[in-house]
Each structure stands twice: as C-alpha cells, then as structure tokens.
Swiss-Prot record:
One annotated GO molecular function: mismatched DNA binding
GO CC entries: mismatch repair complex
Any Gene Ontology biological process: mismatch repair
Annotated protein name in UniProt: DNA mismatch repair protein MutL
UniProt region (Disordered), positions on chain: 333-356
Record family assignment: Belongs to the DNA mismatch repair MutL/HexB family.
C-alpha cells in the first residue's frame, strides 16, 4: 500500500482521539484557555450532558479578528515560542491542539472581542470545514460553542455514556478546578437550568472548600504549609478517621495544574501508614509549587501527568511533610475551623506544621457546634512526662495532680469534697484537659469521661495499644536498625535491573540493615540482614525493597515490617477488655493519650475515642425544642 499524506481534517480528528475523550475533555480545554486569557468569571452552559451543546463564555482578554483562523490551526499558540518557553511553561495550555481537534469533531463557533475593540467577530467551523470571519455583537471576552460533539465520528459517539454520567464527569472536573482557582467565579447550567455556582473567594476560605468537598471535610481537614529545598507543599489533608472507600477526594495540583502522579500518591499513602484502616483511602487537597524548569508537563496530550526531574526529592518531601503533620494529631484535638481567625494565613495550620513548630501541643479549637465554655485547650499542657506502658504505675501521682480542689461553695454547704475522684468540680472547669476526667468504665471496655464540651468515650485497649506502639517505635528509632551477619552469605538470583539497583543503592540498603555485594550480572551476595527481622523471609523482603527503590527512590518495607512486629508486641502488652480500672488509672490513660502522637487511632487504624457534645446529647432528648 502506497504511503500518502493525510488530509488536515483527518489529522485533527486523529489528534482529537487523544485530546477529546468525552464532553468533560472539551470543557477542560476550553475553560483552561479562558483562565490563561485572564478570565475572572466563566459561564458553562450544557445540554444533554454536553453532547448536544457546550457553551463556554468568559471575560478574558479576547482574540483579535485576524487571529481567529489562526486560533483553530494546529500547533498555533500564544503561550510559547521556543524550547526554553516549553521547559518553563506556567500556563495551563501550550500545545495548540485543543481548538482544532474539538472543531474537527463538532459544529464549532468561536466568538470573541478584545476589550479595546468596538465589536466582536465570529468564526464557524462545521466538522473541520472553516468558514469566514464575520462581525458579531459580543461583550469583551470569548464565547466558544461546541454543538453535536462527535456528530461526524459515530464510532466515538456510540461509546459515550448516559447523560447523567457525562454530566458527572464534567462536574467532577469543575470541582477540581474550583479548588485550584477560588479567585474565579464559575457558573454552570444544564438543560437551561442553573445547576452550580462557585463564588469567588480566598484560597484558605471555608466557603470554597466546603461547597466543593462538603462541610464534613472542611471540619476534619488539617491544614499543611511547608517549604524547603525550593519546594512548597500546602493545602489540606483529612484526619485519618475521615477516610474514604475510594480515591474520589484526592486532589493534587502541581504549579496550579491538576495532575495524577503515582510517586506523590505513594508518598501520601506512606505518610498515612499505620493510622489508616485497612482498605480505606485518605482524602486530601494538596498544592505542590516548584520552579517550572524542575517539572516536565509535556508528557501527556491531555496534560494529566507530569514528570519530575527530582522525583526522589519530591517523594521524600511530600512524605515527610505529611507524616509530620499527621504525627502531631492527638486524641482530644479538633482541627481549627477553616473559617476561624487566621484562616487567610497560609501559615496558620490546624494540627499541621505551623502549629508544631513552636509547641509540643497542637492547637485545640472548639468542635463545631459544641456547647462548651469556649475554653482554649491550647493553654493546657501535660504537667509531666508520659507514663510507661502500664497505666497503674503512677496512679497516685495522677490522682494528686488532677484532683480539683474543693470549692468554697461546697465547703460552706457541707458538701463532700471531690478530691481524690479525679473529677472536676464542674464540666466547665477552665482547667479541664482535652479528654476531660474519667467518670466510669462501661462493660470493662470503654472509658466514659466528662470534658468541657460533653462526653468522651474511649476504647481503652485500642488507646493503650497505640501508646505502647509509639513508645516502642521511639525506642527503636533511637538505637537504629542493627544488622545481623549471616553465617553463610546468601546468594540471590535477581534480574539485571534489580542487580543494578542494589549496586547503585548499596549505601541506602546498608542503612536498612542489608549488606549486599554484586556477585554477577544477575546475582547478589547478601551478607547481613536486619536483626529485628531475622525470622522474616529476607529474600522476599529484599526483592520488595529493591522494587521500591527502583520505582520510588526509597523504601519503607523494612520500617513497615519492623512496625508490624512492634504493633503486635504493643497489642499483646495493652490492657485487655474486662479488666476493671480505677478512676485514677483511667485518668492516667487519658493523659497519656493527650501526650501521644497519632493517639486518635490504634495501630490498625481504628478510632480510639469519640466525642458527644452537650448539643448532641440535648438532641437525643429533644431538649430546647
């Protein structure tokens, strides 16, 4: 068969197969063009899920009449002019493929007016066939109409889903955009009816976060903001107990561009580690900012993916930032309301990095809807170091420390003193710590405590398990991983890529407890293994570690295996169900929870405590109605 030059229309239709997957792809490309043009308001009109009509109207800079035909030509763009521009591109679009690709598979109309022009101009394209530029009344800005998407490519049109499904994809992308660009007003209508409006606001305002991901996420989000090595990571991560069955609330933006990146997703999952219940997914909205020259955005035609020039550094930066933020969450801590004072300050965090820099105790804001006294828990700090693994070892000290003095009213009325019970005189006592004071034990499993806001219920085994686990980890971290030499070196047959990785990462492997030398093109000599994991399967473990090093530049397999062992030890050492605790012992456990990192979840990701405010309890009994 002879080689022939393809016609321009067919070339554009082939390109549309990569750029225009469904109506949501069209909306994405057109709205990104509007934002690159400086628009502060974008109206999106849809019919039949975007298949019959997509109309995007913006108030951006507009296009000159003589540039309209050029705007729908392949690889014509105002955003880059050289390779240097491509390597440092900061705009959302730059390839010059979207408009001609969309126009080749639809009935397309482009109308625009510059702010200094007397009137607008319009250009119609029918299935890739270019019309004439004609004058048309139009407000400053640009309107793009896309009718009958894929009308001339029936094979593509039959693969489109139901109207509701296609509309859902558009709405999901608009949610992602609304999180990244809160300064832009977005108005959406479907089949002639308004369906969504995102009002302009501040990045750290609760309005945009709440209306996109829900008020529950906004209440449970920890704000993070950390910079270093020319990188900045800021945004929100949900507390571990706010987890999802799917990845539907995971948003990553690199220099303002919504992307998917396996390395960053892996770093986030690692950071949640042993605080996330099995099979659950974390929720987050993260913005990573770095020099555009350090990231390649010209990887995918739809620009969904990026390639970092320092992938290992990015992975480690994200992991350590989020791990630090999550590590400093403690039982009794409620994230600050997003709309509270300092909400507009990127450095103001809720249990995140901004708080932990200056204090060992996070800021304890009042829970939303609580009927407490408004006492600022940030003023309360434990007055002693944490206990050992057994809560009864210092019960006398705790009893003396936390027993409130009798009030003068009690003494004058002849009422018995509450000293020695571990209970405050009233629930509104300004000295009440976050988890309050124990009042009873329920079925030998749960501790019931009263704090300034209401009732606290603690799973005593889960809580004590986490306390012991964190102490075991800290003890082992202080002495490091010891290597245990093998009497007979083990020869391991591996692939050539694995052998190259082992040779290149010899120093990293040594810090993990492995002493490895290359024995041949596809074999390794293993002379020592981590002592703590001597009874594990070193061959399988080493293969997993090498796979992680090759894929992500680092591995936590050893640490994870060690943590699993320590978790088992802590579980066996924790207080068991049906063991009766005295009130001072229960108070000792509560104080240790408040001083222990990640104490909101046990080693397996289950919650260790729950709060019921007075407002919640009042609703149970219909009080105040």
């Amino acid at each position: 068969m002879a080689i022939r030059q393809l016609p321009e229309i067919l070339i554009n239709q082939i390109a549309a197969g990569e750029v225009v997957e469904r109506p949501a792809s069209v909306v994405k490309e057109l709205v990104e063009n509007a934002l690159d043009a400086g628009a502060t308001r974008v109206d999106i009109e849809l019919e039949e899920g975007g298949v019959r009509l997509i109309r995007i109207r913006d108030n951006g800079g507009g296009i000159a009449p003589d540039e309209l035909p050029l705007a729908v030509s392949r690889h014509a763009t105002s955003k880059i002019a050289s390779l240097d521009d491509l390597e440092t591109v900061a705009t959302l679009g730059f390839r010059g493929e979207a408009l001609p690709s969309i126009a080749s598979v639809s009935r397309f109309t482009l109308t625009s007016r510059r702010h200094d022009a007397e009137h607008g101009s319009a250009l119609e394209i029918d299935g890739g066939r270019l019309g004439e530029v004609v004058p048309r009344a139009h407000a400053p800005g640009t309107t793009v109409e896309v009718r009958e998407l894929f009308f001339n490519v029936p094979a593509r049109r039959k693969f489109l889903r139901a109207e509701r499904t296609e509309l859902g994809h558009i709405e999901e992308w608009l949610r992602s955009l609304a999180l990244a660009r809160p300064d832009v007003e977005l108005r959406v209508s479907h089949n002639g009816k308004p369906s969504r409006r995102y009002k302009p606001g501040d990045l750290y305002s609760d309005a945009r976060l709440g209306e996109t991901l829900g008020d529950d996420f906004a209440r449970q989000a920890l704000r993070v903001d950390h910079s270093g090595a020319g990188l900045r990571l800021h945004g929100w991560v949900a507390q571990p107990h706010y987890s999802r069955a799917s990845t539907d609330q995971q948003y990553l933006y690199v220099n303002g561009r919504s992307v998917r990146d396996r390395s960053v997703a892996h770093a986030v999952k690692m950071a949640y580690g042993d605080v996330l219940f099995h099979g659950r997914q974390p929720a987050y909205v993260l913005f990573l900012e770095l020099d555009p020259a350090r990231v390649d955005v010209n990887v995918h035609p739809a620009k969904h993916e990026v390639r970092f020039r320092e992938a290992r550094l990015i992975h480690d930066f994200v992991y350590r930032t989020l791990q630090d933020a999550l590590a400093h969450t403690r039982a009794g801590v409620t994230p600050n309301s997003i709309g509270s004072d300092g909400a507009g300050d990127p450095g103001a965090t809720a249990g995140g990095l901004g708080n932990i820099a200056g204090s060992g105790v996070p800021n304890h804001g009042n829970a939303a809807g609580s009927s407490g006294s408004g006492y600022n828990y940030a003023s309360w700090t434990p007055s002693q170091t944490p206990l050992g693994l057994r809560v009864d070892e210092a019960r006398a000290a705790y009893s003396a420390l936390y027993a409130p003095p009798p009030s003068s009213a009690q003494q004058s009325a002849g009422m018995p003193s509450m000293a020695g019970t571990g209970l405050p005189a009233t629930a509104q006592d300004s000295g009440v710590p976050p988890l309050g004071y124990a009042v009873a034990q329920l079925h030998g499993i749960y501790i019931l405590a009263e704090n300034a806001e209401g009732l606290i219920v603690v799973d005593m085994h889960a809580a004590h398990e986490r306390i012991g686990y964190e102490r075991l980890k800290n003890a082992h971290d202080s002495i490091g991983l010891h290597a245990q030499p093998l009497l007979v070196p083990m020869t391991l047959a591996v692939g050539e890529r694995e052998a190259d990785t082992a040779e290149r990462e010899a120093e990293t492997l040594a810090t993990l407890g492995f002493e490895i030398t290359r024995a041949g093109p596809q074999s390794l000599h293993v002379r020592s293994i981590p002592a703590l994991l001597a009874n594990a399967e070193p061959e399988a473990l080493l293969r997993d570690v090498l796979g992680d090093l090759r894929e992500h530049g680092q591995s936590r397999r050893i640490a994870s295996a060690r943590d699993e062992l320590l978790s088992t030890m802590a579980c066996h050492g924790a207080v068991r169900a049906n063991r009766r605790l005295t009130v001072p012992e229960m108070n000792a456990l509560l104080r240790d929870m408040e001083a222990t990192e990640r104490s909101g979840q046990c080693n397996h990701g289950r919650p260790t405590w729950a709060r019921f405010t007075l407002s919640d309890i009042d609703r149970w009994f219909l009080r105040g109605r």
